């Protein structure tokens, strides 16, 4: 069984790079676990610990031989250990990655680019999550290489607190996004007046 080498390059600071080796068996297809800092839909109460964020997310998949979501799960399964951004917002980043990857990629040479530009309302359990007024600008490159295959992920998430208005209605996000999370349904409410505004409930 081949050992997979994972090299993480931290681009949060352009002058700084960080690497972290790891290994995983090829036949291991575990899904991500849902981020525990999010409040389950049935526990949603009032507006406590809610934060509105205008999200600009971009995930670029670099692979000369194509890729599958199984490989992406291999890369992302240890995301908690290699994440280089603000840890109060790691759950937000996970959800943005999942939602971005549920969309249609735009080819860019031998690469595929997934983009997400939405306004979400997040609610965190207890006192978890970002502070009032806190924002995020996160960028990181994750590379997966087993000497026979190479897949790189370039992740960029910008989250700025903002305000949205209008009535909302319930929808379910593309199930492909949920494939990255075990036993998790990404349920949202979307504004009738603004198709890019959603309330992320779970």
UniProtKB/Swiss-Prot annotation:
A Pfam match: Rhabdo_M2
Substitution effect: residue 11 to C: In strain: Isolate SAD1-3670 var 1 and Isolate SAD1-3670 var 2
Keywords: Apoptosis, Host cytoplasm, Host membrane, Host-virus interaction, Membrane, Viral budding, Viral budding via the host ESCRT complexes, Viral envelope protein, Viral matrix protein, Viral release from host cell, Virion
Topology of this chain in the membrane: Peripheral membrane protein
Subunit: Homomultimer. Interacts with nucleoprotein and with the cytoplasmic domain of glycoprotein. Interacts with host ATP6V1A; this interaction plays an important role in virion uncoating after viral entry.
UniProt free text on domains: Late-budding domains (L domains) are short sequence motifs essential for viral particle budding. They recruit proteins of the host ESCRT machinery (Endosomal Sorting Complex Required for Transport) or ESCRT-associated proteins. Matrix protein contains one L domain: a PPXY motif which potentially interacts with the WW domain 3 of NEDD4 E3 ubiquitin ligase (Potential).
General remark: Most abundant protein in the virion.
Protein name: Matrix protein
Species for this entry: Rabies virus (strain SAD B19) (RABV)
Source species taxonomy: Viruses, Riboviria, Orthornavirae, Negarnaviricota, Haploviricotina
């Amino acid at each position: 069984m081949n050992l997979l080498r994972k090299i993480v390059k931290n681009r949060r600071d352009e002058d700084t790079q960080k690497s972290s080796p790891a290994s995983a068996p090829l036949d291991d297809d575990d899904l991500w676990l849902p981020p525990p800092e999010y409040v389950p839909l049935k526990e949603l109460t009032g507006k406590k610990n809610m934060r509105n964020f205008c999200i600009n997310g971009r995930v670029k998949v670099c692979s000369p031989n194509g890729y599958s979501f199984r490989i992406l799960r291999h890369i992302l399964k240890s995301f908690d250990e290699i994440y280089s951004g603000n840890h109060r917002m790691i759950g937000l980043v996970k959800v943005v990655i999942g939602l971005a990857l549920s969309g249609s990629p735009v080819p860019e040479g031998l690469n595929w680019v997934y983009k997400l530009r939405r306004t979400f309302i997040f609610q965190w359990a207890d006192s978890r999550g970002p502070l009032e007024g806190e924002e995020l600008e996160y960028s990181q490159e994750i590379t997966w290489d087993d000497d026979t295959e190479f897949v790189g992920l370039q992740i960029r998430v910008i989250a700025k607190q903002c305000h949205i208005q209008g009535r909302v209605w319930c929808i379910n996000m593309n199930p492909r996004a949920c494939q990255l999370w075990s036993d998790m349904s990404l349920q949202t409410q979307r504004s009738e007046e603004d198709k890019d505004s959603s309330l992320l409930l779970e």
